[in-house]
A protein has these predicted regions:
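Active-site rim elements
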Residues: 16-20, 103-108, 145-148
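Acidic/histidine-rich alpha-helical segments that form the ligand environment
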Residues: 24-36, 93-131, 151
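Short, contiguous alpha-helical
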Residues: 1-12, 46-92, 97, 116-119, ...
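Short low-complexity stretches enriched in small and charged residues
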Residues: 12-17, 24-31, 72-77, 113-115
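Short, contiguous, helix-prone interaction/anchoring segments in small proteins
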Residues: 17-50
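A short secondary-structure junction motif
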Residues: 36, 40-43, 81, 125-128, ...
């Protein structure tokens, strides 16, 4: 039986070794995300993707929140003289805030904008830039190459939460 928490499996860097493919995944997320929620009703959007999991609405808003943070972390790593220590956040607590009950279109617009800018930034980066790092206080040093791979997976992971829920429910 598939684990609904990880519909595409847990993150494994070996599966995300192509920088070009990872960048394309970042570029493609806005369209893929829109397609994943297209035509869903409010009732469907308020359905958890698994027992005890976020609703589809919360998942869309989480993608916007998380990818804003990642884009900012890229910019910090590219512009600071030393590897910056980034500030983690409580994503589960963010998902409970009132703005996560708003229409998903608000976050789809954010994802459109962030991913357009992120794609432009990725296209401008050199090999050396991708080796720049930031420090996560809980998980240590991350190169931007590794973060790109993680967020390519993250994009596909949460899109799969949406699409697998639709498929399971015949929506």
């Amino acid at each position: 039986m598939n684990d609904a928490r990880y519909p595409i499996g847990k993150f494994d860097t070996a599966n995300y070794s192509s920088r070009a493919e990872n960048a394309r995944t970042i570029s493609d997320l806005p369209a893929n995300l829109r397609a994943a929620v297209d035509g869903l009703t409010d009732e469907q959007l308020d359905t958890p993707y698994r027992d005890g999991g976020w609703t589809l609405r919360q998942t869309v808003h989480h993608l916007a929140d998380s990818h804003i943070n990642s884009f900012c972390r890229f910019k910090l790593a590219l512009t600071e003289d030393e590897a910056p220590t980034i500030r983690p956040y409580y994503e589960d607590r963010w998902a409970e805030l009132a703005d996560n009950r708003m229409p998903v279109d608000t976050s789809l617009k954010i994802v459109d904008g962030i991913h357009s800018r992120w794609t432009s930034l990725l296209e401008s980066m050199t090999d050396e830039d991708f080796q720049r790092e930031f420090v996560h206080p809980e998980t240590g040093n991350w190169t931007l190459e590794a973060v790109l791979a993680l967020y390519a997976w993250h994009s596909q992971h949460h899109t799969a939460h949406l699409t697998s829920t639709r498929e399971r429910n015949g929506w």
